[in-house]
């Protein structure tokens, strides 16, 4: 094609034609927004899968923090709910008294938190974590 509709639809320019004129998608750059799905009149990219992005560590208030996206696109709603449960278990097990979840993520490091959240380690220790004697008290 002279003008690739997928390339035109990509807001971050991850879809580009190479020197041979064939479309390539830079998987490191692509944020999986789905805007390119169904744009080709020749149906080269019609098959898309709906998914969910999960962000952790965000915070509103006086000390705003932007959440960071886990490097996985979840395609199953139950898997997302499990990840939310794991985030709560992570906060309960690794959070310190008076600390917000965003602070916990910053303290243990996003890469470490992501590794833990994408494993089933916390769900296996759920009863133990729920049995912990913890003290809340986060302040704004």
For the regions a language model picked out, list residue spans one by one.
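Short beta-strand elements
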Residues: 52-60
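Short glycine/threonine-rich loop-to-helix capping motif typified by GTGT followed
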Residues: 105-122
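A hydrophobic, small-residue-rich beta->alpha segment in the mid-to-C-terminal subdomain
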Residues: 60-97
């Amino acid at each position: 094609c002279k003008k690739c509709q997928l390339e035109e639809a990509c807001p971050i320019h991850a879809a580009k034609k190479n020197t041979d004129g064939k479309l390539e998608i830079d998987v490191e750059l692509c944020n999986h927004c789905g805007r390119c799905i169904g744009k080709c009149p020749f149906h080269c990219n019609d098959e898309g899968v709906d998914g969910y992005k999960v962000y952790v560590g965000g915070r509103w208030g006086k000390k705003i923090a932007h959440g960071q996206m886990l490097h996985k696109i979840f395609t199953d709603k139950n898997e997302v709910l499990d990840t939310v449960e794991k985030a709560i278990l992570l906060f309960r097990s690794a959070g310190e008294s008076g600390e917000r979840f965003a602070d916990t993520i910053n303290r243990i490091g996003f890469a470490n938190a992501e590794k833990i959240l994408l494993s089933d380690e916390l769900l296996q220790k759920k009863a133990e974590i729920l049995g912990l004697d913890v003290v809340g008290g986060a302040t704004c």
